[in-house]
Every structure is written in C-alpha cells, then in structure tokens.
Amino acid sequence: MVGGCCGRKILESRDEGELGYASLESKSEIPGKIMIDHVILTVSDFKRSVAFYAKALKPLGITTFIDYEGKDGHPDLKGFGDGKRYFFWLKEGKPDPQAVHVGFVAKDHSEVDAFYKAALAAGGKSKESPQARLEYYPGYYATWVLDPDGHDIEVVNKS
C-alpha cells in the first residue's frame, strides 16, 4: 500500500508501476507506521490557536507541547504530540485555510465525540457534527470543525 484517503487504498501496481484505487476488503486499522512525519499549520494569532488546539486535541491523547525557537529565518513553532513525538506544529503568519485539511485518528467513536465537544468549547465552529459517513468507508465515523482561522480539521474513527 502506498497511501490512502477517504476509505480507499492507493495501491502500486507491480506490473505497470502505475497507481490505482482498490476497495478495502477489511476494516481499517490504525497503521503501525505513519508515513507523514509532521504538519505545520500557519495561524493568524499564535496564542489563540495554541489555546484552541491544546483543548481540542486533549481527548485524542495529544497532550504534550514543545516550543521551537526559530533561528536564521526559521519561524518560531509550537509543537503538539503524544509524549513520544511531536507531529503537529503551528507557526504564526498569514493562513490560507482553504489550502489545508487535517485529519486526526480517533481510537473509537467516543474520542470523536469528545474532540467535537472540546473543539467547540475552545472556540471552534462546527462544520459537521459527529456522524457515520458510510459512503466514505464501512465504519467511517467522523466530525469536522473549523479552527479559529477557518482550517478544516477532521477527526475520524474507522472501526
């Protein structure tokens, strides 16, 4: 498997070297190896966004933070992680919310629901309340919120 989105696996054809889509035959599992190392999201108000994500991501177990002081033209960053690694970063600047969609994995439906409540309480706006989206994938249960800058943030469980 090369990658996947919205319930479809993108497979590499060994014969032709082309990429194609294939249906999933079994229920999704949280992969043992994540192929994306990190995401940096540009936000307009650093303090506001740090406060929002600290509260909104807590139900997902993303509870540790690190400050990175940029040097030689690199921006200051705030990193979020699970205690083992930092993979979600914020930097201050001019955001382009239409250019970004970030999806976080939840271990079950209750984590999806808890994220939604926490995100709204932290100042996020509902895009879609937690619900099954079986047209994406069997067992696809997700919610979508807009962060304070309007970035589209999804939390999904595929069980």
Labelled PLM ranges:
Residues C5-C6:
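Cysteine-centered motifs
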Residues S44-K47, G103-P148:
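Vicinal oxygen chelate
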Residues H74-Y116:
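Long, continuous compositionally biased terminal/linker segments
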Residues I40-R85:
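Core segments of cupin and vicinal oxygen chelate
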Residues D37, T64, I153-K158:
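Long, contiguous binding/interaction regions
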Residues S28-V50, V102, S159:
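N-terminal beta-strand motif that seeds the catalytic metal site of vicinal oxygen chelate
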